[in-house]
Amino acid sequence: MASLFKKKTVDDIIKDQNKELKGQQRAITRDRTALEKQEKQLEMEIKKMAKAGNKDACKVLAKQLVQLRKQKTRTYAVSSKVTSMSTQTKVMSSQMKMAGAMSTTAKTMQAVNKKMDPQKTLQTMQNFQKENMKMEMTEEMINDTLDDIFDASEDEEESQDIVNQVLDEIGIEISGKMAKAPSAAKGLPSASASKSTGISDEEIERQLKALGVD
């Protein structure tokens, strides 16, 4: 019962109007079909009276045919008018829906604009840019430090390899010379023996410099 007293919305009114226009269009089409049948019947009657030589009957039937055809022509005009009204109703409905959508969008945009402070938004973007730059600088410093550590480690390894190589060469040379030297008592060798069999500090330093080790 509540639905009977419910106030119709604009959409409901438009739907009812479209329904009514469609009903009128169907009625016009039925009337035109009936007029076309009558038109054919009159044409047949006129031909029949003409064959019978009844001129008066032919004139009367011819007048009826003219009136009927005029009436049929009017049905086309009315049908065109109904179609135009239906089209206008559809356009009006589309415009109303568009207006409703625009109204909803405008309200949403208005609510968003109220919550968004341009000054705060600008400040937030500036803070983000500042912090992003800090992060990039920190990352760059960390990368540079790691590169220095790895480079220093590689240099140290290369230097150690060179020193080991020199010591190995010196050790081999010393072993060779020590093998040829006469064995002494368990005491220290004499100065002349050390000079003839050992390698001096100058010799070691010269070989280190030759290998690029300061």
From Swiss-Prot:
It comes from the Eukaryota. It holds the Pfam family Snf7. Gene3D superfamilies: 6.10.140.1230. Residues 25-55 form a coiled coil. InterPro entries: Snf7_fam. Keywords: Coiled coil, Cytoplasm, Endosome, Membrane, Protein transport, Transport. This is Charged multivesicular body protein 2b-A. The gene is chmp2b-a.
